[in-house]
Amino acid sequence: MRPTRSVPIAAVATASALVLAGCAGSPAAAPAADVAADPVYEGTLTVLTKFGGAPLEDYFEDIAAAYEKKHPDVDVELIQETDQSIKDKTKTLTASQALPDIYFTWTGDWAENFISGGLAADLTELIAPGTEWGDRFGEASLSAFESDGKYYGIPLYNNGKFMGYNKSAFADAGVEVPTTFDELIETCAPLRAAGYEPIAFGNKDGWPALHYLQQLFAYNVPSDTLRADFDPETAAWDHPGYEASLTQFQTLVNDCTDSGKGTNGVLYTTAQEALAGGRAAMYYQEVLEFDTVTAEGATLTTDDFGIFPLPVPDDADGDPEAIEGAPEGYLINARSPRAALAADFMKFATEPERAATLSSLPYGQPSTVVGAVTEQNSSKAVYEGIDRVNQASQLVAWLDTVTVPEVADAWLAGGEALISGSATPEEVLDSVRAANDGAK
């Protein structure tokens, strides 16, 4: 599994410039896209996807063919890019003012740049919770593309972070699934005594540490405060829940991993393989990884694989029902003369039967459409994970995509420093505050 969060952190560094470049020379008051108008079923509709390459590319090709069959006077032109190439293609198209009618987006700062730049159509009337289209999706997925009370994005597939565990290892050690963070730490000694690495962890790429931190932030910091701290103009990063989270993270690294201070030299795939190979009892992972750890050849079986949310610390001040994760989806070009047709196409693309296809092999992308991920077309763990994501009170996006690049980089360095022991929690927070001040 490729760490998709790392793409926007590189891309987002240029996103503001891209949007400005795309806006340069355009009329001062471009007409707003009327996405709620009756679509005119003629002409060419352009769509920039992130499904380039086998097997994903067939998904939108099949949808385009079906839509063209239903509406013979419409030609759907697909621009299919990969996870690696999408950011450069978006840069080129935005700078040349050739942004397609529909285009891929991540959540967080990346999407916000297109929204604030006037390049994303307001879809509130069509897709807000309570609308016919919006009710197809979990509210948390829709909220990931919400800005100032308006809804801009069409969530396509979902993801979330959970602790995966080996049920047999827990049985061997005589421990139960923990319900608090302290209980999680308390399971580590008996698991190690039973011959397992309690929690496999690899942070060579930097972002895995941030996944622990962001989930702990969601638990320990009130949601309004956390959201305000994602914006440099309103951020303070001074709630005591941050320092508590950093301390809890250090405890987990020191007490529950065999790699300890050397975790920064371990790949996340090595940690993943430790759980799959039956050597580790737990590994903190994304829903998209679930089927990897029980794939053919793995020691860990689907029957022995279980998941649970990272347990909530006692006396936490945040949201105990929040799940860290983020959907990926699409925006409609606010300046497209075919905005209504674009909205109609995306309604077609997210109909339940197509959402079920997306969630099934060979695609295996858990659709954000509620009910699309079933026990029949998905593994038990994926089904459970996506159900939990859909029922979450909110999705808290990856720390390195929801913050601006300067702050994200400070957190990446801070996570590594906490692991190695080269900085204290307060020193890490000082560096984040300094980066935030520089980003204002």
Across the structure, where does each feature detected by a protein language model lie?
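Hinge/lid segment of periplasmic solute-binding proteins
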Residues: 108-161, 185, 212, 241, ...
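Extracytoplasmic/periplasmic solute-binding protein
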Residues: 152-156, 161, 185-235, 280
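A structural signal for short loop-to-beta-strand junctions that line the ligand-binding cleft
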Residues: 100-101, 133-168, 197-201, 318-323, ...
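Short, low-complexity disordered leader/linker segments with a strong preference
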Residues: 1-46, 69, 430, 434-440
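C-terminal capping/gating helix-and-loop segments adjacent to ligand/active sites or protein-protein/ligand interfaces
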Residues: 364-371, 383-436
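Extracytoplasmic/periplasmic substrate-recognition and gating elements
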Residues: 65, 69, 173, 254-257, ...
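Extracytoplasmic "Venus flytrap"/periplasmic binding protein-like
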Residues: 66-136, 168, 172-179, 273, ...
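Glycine-centered hinge/linker elements that transmit conformational signals in sensory
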Residues: 190, 231-263
